Amino acid sequence: MVFVMSAWSASGQDSLTLVFAGDIMQHESQMKAAFDPAKGSYDYRGVFEGVKPWIQSADIAIANLELTFGGKPYTGYPQFSAPDEFLAAIKDAGFDVLVTANNHSVDRGRSGLERTLRRLDSAGLLHTGTFADTLDFLNHYPLILEARGFRISLLNYTYGTNGIAVRRPNRVNPIDTAQIRKDLARARQQKTDAVVVVFHWGDEYQQLPNRAQQEVAGFCLSQGAKLIIGSHPHVLQPMYWNRDQDNLVVYSLGNFISGQRARYRNGGALLHVTLRKDHTAEGTPRTTLADVSYSLSWVNRLPDSRRSFRLVPVGDPVDSLAVTGSNSRALYKEFINDSRVFLDRENRNVGERARRKRD
């Protein structure tokens, strides 16, 4: 099935911008901060306000939804079920697509998985990775996104579901190279301009990818994938743009929004990708990676009565002023320094957008 994100102008638009975010989570501390006892409801206004311009500037914005909208009772770790008001905030932030295959997909069993899919549909958010049944999978996978004259295939897989069985007829895509091979072949048959694969993989809190991640990434590249994006470690991992082979592997974007406050886990990165389509003399278009960069964002807790959560875009001097208090300022600076030192050392051809603009 094809979903049109935006129209293509007759002027011959030949570039497409994508933004990828890491893990969207909802811990108990986040729910407590958002709860309004006077209204008996949850208020997430402002959580994403600082990074909205980054998200909304993209033609397509994609994130990893690492929770369910399984209904009450609302719970955080270890089995997540977030208030529906949080979904409204995600939509308002500007996200277009959520990938849903991860180790928390069936935290609320079959009913939670299916309710999550219904809520995403009601909100007008596209999704892939989990399915109500086999027919749903066959009709909607790979997910094809159309924008500005581009057709993009999106695939999504997880290493597991925390030992919770996926109840029939539900489906959660596992990392199975035999099945992935078939899915990538199907994507090629759909004649899309680029194939994007998002994996939930790796070791939690480890900054370097393990051998399994590297092997699966290499396998997918050999089968025609152009972009591979990872989640699950909850910390940043390296980003490799192979200009010669024209492909990109980002092993982990870290936490986008969560209640985790430990070092390396209290923020993450947004990935900015520009695809360019060139029309050859024979009329056969060729799509390449024209530009790749990242932006850091940090999760701040405000000094208000609720200790509200706010995303702070690193590099924006106005938003950084919102980080007040000596302890918060110290944590903010620590995250920036840790992230820059690590990514400057490990990344290949992927730099920070804010610093590149200053240069």
Q: Where do the model's predicted regions map?
A:
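Bacterial N-terminal signal peptides
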Residues: 1-7
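Acidic, metal/ion-coordinating pockets
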Residues: 12-359
